């Protein structure tokens, strides 16, 4: 398994026959600047979306049309994407598990909102914000928390799914900050590896992973604070 952080909450995950883009906010992502969209989208089989905000949907429509990738999203967001011309859509909702060939994805809870703002400035709700629990046969499992604050039912997510790897938002203001994210990981999860994300993209969110790294000191979790475009093989 190879996980590449593309900046913000965007990841490329390569495993077996699957090449996944998660929340592919790329062309307007300052952290992605200097990377090649065609390179990171090459061979993509699936695009997975945690919720409908622009900094997560990102380049989904263009990339899905270009690559033919299957797009997974909550039902409301999937319907909206269908209106944009996408037809290879897998939709679900909180608690549902979708089989996607060599892996499965379960929609978990997240404390956040989900919407798109149209040109007239109106915000249109697009279902629930979610995390995504990814299970691969005979490989480490991944919980992409999505955008969220800490909540006690994270313990149930851990009990049900036992995720090995956590993709953890730490930027504050729109999600939990680094110290709270560390508390969430230590109290509710038994991650073998935690990768912080959703930081450093905009001036108004945390610029480094320092608070998260400090909060995780002494835990059994291996924290990998990647640089944009940096990869981790597991």
UniProtKB/Swiss-Prot annotation:
Question: MF terms per GO, please?
Answer: hydrolase activity
Q: Which SUPFAM superfamilies match?
A: Metallo-hydrolase/oxidoreductase
Keywords attached to this Swiss-Prot or TrEMBL record, sorted alphabetically, are: Hydrolase
What Pfam families does this protein map onto?
Answer: Lactamase_B_2
Instruction: Give the top-rank taxon of the lineage listed in the UniProt record for this protein.
Output: Bacteria
The family line of this record is: Belongs to the UPF0173 family.
Matching entries from PANTHER family are given as:
UPF0173 METAL-DEPENDENT HYDROLASE MJ1163, UPF0173 METAL-DEPENDENT HYDROLASE MJ1163-RELATED
What NCBIfam families is this protein classified in? PRK00685.1
Q: What is this protein called?
A: UPF0173 metal-dependent hydrolase Rleg2_1519
């Amino acid at each position: 398994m190879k996980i590449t952080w593309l900046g913000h909450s965007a990841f490329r995950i390569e495993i077996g026959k699957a090449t996944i883009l998660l929340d592919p906010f790329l062309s307007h992502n300052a952290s992605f600047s200097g990377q090649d969209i065609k390179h990171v989208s090459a061979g993509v089989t699936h695009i997975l979306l945690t919720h409908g905000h622009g900094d997560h949907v990102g380049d989904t429509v263009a990339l899905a049309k270009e690559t033919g990738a299957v797009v997974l999203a909550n039902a409301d967001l999937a319907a909206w994407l269908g209106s944009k011309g996408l037809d290879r859509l897998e939709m679900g909702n909180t608690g549902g598990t979708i089989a996607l060939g060599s892996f499965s994805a379960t929609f978990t809870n997240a404390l956040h909102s989900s919407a798109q703002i149209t040109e007239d400035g109106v915000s249109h709700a697009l279902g629930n914000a979610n995390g995504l629990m990814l299970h691969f046969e005979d490989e480490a499992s991944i919980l992409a928390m999505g955008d969220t604050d800490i909540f006690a039912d994270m313990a149930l997510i851990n009990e049900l799914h036992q995720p090995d790897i956590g993709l953890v938002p730490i930027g504050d203001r729109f999600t939990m900050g680094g110290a709270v994210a560390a508390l969430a990981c230590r109290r509710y999860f038994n991650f073998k590896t935690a990768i912080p994300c959703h930081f450093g993209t905009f001036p108004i969110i945390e610029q480094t992973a320092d608070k998260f790294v400090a909060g995780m000191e002494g835990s059994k979790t291996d924290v990998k604070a990647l640089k944009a475009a940096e990869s981790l093989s597991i």
